[in-house]
């Protein structure tokens, strides 16, 4: 009986995928590709874009921060969606 109960608990945890954390890209313009695991409860990745005297700048990470023009932002909700 205990074995059955333990088996049901393990199957429930695996099926519910408890503790899932979103993975987002977090590299900046022209840097090697890197990722980060977002904090618990964070379910969004972002990419921001803006121009400066060197050209287009890009920043990526977890969350969906507010930005002001001329910065543009794209937010998404799946692993590695912000590349």
UniProtKB/Swiss-Prot annotation:
Disulfide bonds join 24-45, 38-62, 64-75, 76-81. It is found in: Secreted. This is Weak toxin DE-1. One of its GO terms (molecular function) is toxin activity. Residues 1-21 form the signal peptide. GO terms for cellular component: extracellular region. Belongs to the three-finger toxin family. Short-chain subfamily. Type I alpha-neurotoxin sub-subfamily. CDD domains: TFP_snake_toxin (cd00206). Expressed by the venom gland. The keyword Disulfide bond applies. It comes from Ophiophagus hannah (King cobra). InterPro entries: Snake_3FTx, Snake_toxin-like_sf, Snake_toxin_con_site, Toxin_cobra-type. Keywords: Disulfide bond, Secreted, Signal, Toxin. It comes from the Eukaryota.
């Amino acid at each position: 009986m205990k074995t059955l109960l333990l088996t049901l608990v393990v199957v429930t945890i695996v099926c519910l995928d408890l503790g899932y954390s979103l993975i987002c890209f977090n590299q900046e313009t022209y840097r090697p590709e890197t990722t980060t695991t977002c904090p618990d409860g964070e379910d969004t990745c972002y990419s921001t874009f803006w121009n400066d005297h060197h050209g287009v700048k890009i920043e990526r990470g977890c969350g969906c921060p507010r930005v002001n023009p001329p910065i543009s932002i794209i937010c998404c909700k799946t692993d590695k969606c912000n590349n």
